């Protein structure tokens, strides 16, 4: 078992322009303060204010956006981190675990990971993800690349179709097709931080947002030992080399996770479970009284003194006792949130410490709040009620379907760029406008400069005479379109779709 020494994990070095050495605790703190500044001031964080949490295109400022949700996650993450450090101090383990001079960076890395955890999410949340993946699956047919005769391959892209006698190229084609059909917000977050925004964060800070450890091109069965850690794609083929270096710098075995990521994940789970229900009441999907009844019915029979009684019933009774009846809803959610935090945060901290050997190594194959405890049951209660009463509400489903259509429609609109030959697209990139390609020229001009530069840089690194050049160029071209559309805010995507479909 590896010795627990966080000095080997909280790596303050960066990929580029890293200080040659640090001499004091203050030097290390300054490095992580620089990370904070880069993150807080990044456009990716600002765009979260117009991205969906639960209710797309919401005009009511009291309802959460991705940004306000992320700020709440940041605060809960800070709370858990402080609780962990406080308990380790009581146990006199800070020095033994190499944390005595790293408490500030420990908290900061968790906080900033919490703030960043949703930056890769596309417009309209999970329905935006589904729209991107469905659109590419219909055209690339990744399943056809796995087993049946090559003649049955339905892939529409010539450069990605399988060919007899090209074993190594076919293996790469399979990877590329699977990768492009596995868009995921967490993987896009890694791409944003490193490839698109070039934030040059410390290795520890980036490691903390690598929530899932499965490569997006993975098509084999997931190992049972890492079934939870690899349940979703965590990074793309484009970032394979960077993630390999990240693992080396953080001393992580393949498919293992950075220790502080478990805290970020727990903070997210705690934050959204209550917030989604509060937003539903704000939207008048149900009243606070109806919500209490939903929670009561879903929990079932219980004894006085149970966790439900201490958290939910206590919040309800205190809010009813308030003489200002018009603020009873606000009072209920204030008490519910406080009661929930006071139970789940210490429990998450205790789970982190109790499982620290596996967490430090990176192969603890569970979430901190995923077990058979009452705390886990309370979290599941909130999630199940939200799933049944909020996400299945007709108004929410209609907005999600509209979001799915918007993203699918935008991909249709930009498809001419993906249908160009390699020669034509290369000419368009070089000249930016080509007279004989009027539609493609106008579409290319609409792509952001940052995304176009990322494409150009990636393609320029390829050997043009290599057999895989055409398929890898097409891969980066698809990434270009995915980067652009996934980087839109909900409102921008909605307006862009309406403009280009000529419906206004």
Curated annotation (Swiss-Prot):
Q: Which PANTHER family match?
A: DEOXYGUANOSINETRIPHOSPHATE TRIPHOSPHOHYDROLASE, DEOXYNUCLEOSIDE TRIPHOSPHATE TRIPHOSPHOHYDROLASE
Q: What class of enzyme is it?
A: hydrolase
Classification via InterPro entries: dGTP_triP_hydro_central_sf, dGTPase, dGTPase-like, dNTPase_1, HD/PDEase_dom, HD_domain, PHydrolase_assoc_dom
Q: Which GO terms describe its biological process?
A: dGTP catabolic process
Q: Which HAMAP family match?
A: dGTPase_type1 (MF_00030)
This protein is called: Deoxyguanosinetriphosphate triphosphohydrolase
Q: Which reaction does it catalyse?
A: dGTP + H2O = 2'-deoxyguanosine + triphosphate + H(+)
Give its E.C. classification number.
3.1.5.1
> Oligomeric state and partners?
Homotetramer.
What is the documented function of this protein?
dGTPase preferentially hydrolyzes dGTP over the other canonical NTPs.
Name any cofactors this protein relies on: Mg(2+)
Highest taxon above the source species = Bacteria
Q: Name one GO molecular function term.
A: dGTPase activity
HD domain residues: 66-273
Family per record = Belongs to the dGTPase family. Type 1 subfamily.
From what organism does this protein derive?
Klebsiella pneumoniae subsp. pneumoniae (strain ATCC 700721 / MGH 78578)
């Amino acid at each position: 078992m590896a010795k627990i020494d966080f000095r080997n994990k909280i790596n303050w070095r960066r990929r580029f322009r890293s200080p040659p050495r640090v001499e004091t605790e203050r030097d290390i703190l300054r490095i992580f303060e620089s990370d904070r500044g880069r993150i807080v001031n990044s456009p990716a964080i600002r765009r979260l204010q117009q991205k969906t949490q639960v209710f797309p295109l919401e005009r009511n400022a009291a309802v959460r956006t991705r940004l306000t949700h992320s700020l709440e996650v940041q605060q809960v993450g800070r709370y858990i981190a402080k609780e962990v450090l406080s308990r380790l101090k009581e146990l006199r383990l800070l020095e033994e675990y190499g944390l005595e001079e790293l408490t500030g960076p420990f908290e900061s890395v968790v906080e900033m990971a919490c703030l960043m955890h949703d930056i890769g999410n596309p417009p309209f949340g999970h329905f935006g993800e589904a729209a991107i993946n469905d659109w590419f699956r219909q055209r690339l047919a990744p399943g056809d690349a796995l087993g049946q005769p090559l003649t049955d391959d339905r892939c529409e892209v010539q450069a990605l179709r399988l060919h007899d006698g090209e074993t190594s190229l076919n293996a790469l084609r399979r990877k590329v097709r699977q990768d492009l059909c596995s868009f995921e917000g967490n993987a896009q977050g890694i791409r944003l931080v490193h490839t698109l925004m070039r934030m040059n964060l410390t290795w520890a800070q980036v490691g903390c947002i690598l929530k899932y450890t499965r490569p997006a091109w993975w098509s084999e069965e997931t190992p049972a030992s890492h079934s939870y850690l690899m349940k979703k794609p965590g990074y793309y083929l484009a970032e394979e080399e960077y993630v390999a270096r990240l693992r080396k710098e953080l001393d992580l075995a393949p498919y293992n996770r950075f220790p502080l990521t478990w805290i970020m994940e727990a903070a997210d789970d705690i934050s959204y479970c209550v917030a989604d229900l509060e937003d539903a009441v704000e939207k008048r999907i149900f009243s606070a009284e109806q919500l209490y009844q939903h929670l009561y019915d879903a929990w079932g029979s219980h004894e006085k003194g149970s966790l439900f009684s201490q958290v939910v019933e206590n919040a309800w009774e205190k809010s009813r006792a308030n003489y200002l009846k018009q603020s009873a809803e606000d009072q209920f959610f204030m008490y519910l949130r406080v009661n929930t935090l006071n139970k789940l945060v210490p429990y998450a901290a205790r789970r982190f410490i109790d499982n620290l050997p596996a967490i430090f190594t990176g192969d603890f194959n569970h979430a901190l709040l995923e077990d058979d405890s009452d705390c886990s049951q309370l979290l599941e209660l909130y999630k199940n009620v939200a799933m049944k009463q909020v996400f299945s509400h007709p108004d929410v489903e209609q907005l999600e379907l509209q979001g799915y259509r918007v993203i699918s429609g935008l991909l249709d609109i930009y498809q001419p760029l993906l249908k160009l030959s390699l020669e034509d697209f290369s000419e368009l990139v070089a000249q930016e406008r080509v007279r004989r390609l009027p539609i493609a020229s106008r579409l290319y001009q609409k792509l952001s400069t940052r995304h176009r530069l990322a494409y150009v840089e990636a393609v320029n690194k390829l050997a043009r005479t290599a057999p895989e050049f055409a398929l890898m160029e097409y891969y980066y071209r698809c990434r270009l379109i995915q980067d652009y559309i996934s980087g839109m805010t909900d409102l921008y995507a909605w307006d862009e779709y309406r403009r280009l479909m000529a419906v206004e």
